[in-house]
């Protein structure tokens, strides 16, 4: 069963490897229409950043199957979307700098 705290739509500012990222999390995508609506099969996250951390343009749209939330170790929406964003950043070519090294990304 999907934990109740994931069943909402919200906007947050998160930090992805030290870079600020605006995020819109939409469990009910595109929106919740009925009070007793069944859980959706797919949910959506939009990431926007001034830096190119999540994509070259600073914008990234990500869909995921809500079934992935069943039994997850993530305790909050912020943890979930930060974990996904960090994976997207690595997929985008981000490499964390060595200890003490500055980054130009």
What do these predicted ranges mean?
Residues 1-5:
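Short, hydrophobic/π-rich interface segment
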Residues 6-39:
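Amphipathic, interaction-prone secondary-structure segments
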Residues 44-105:
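Acidic, low-complexity intrinsically disordered segments
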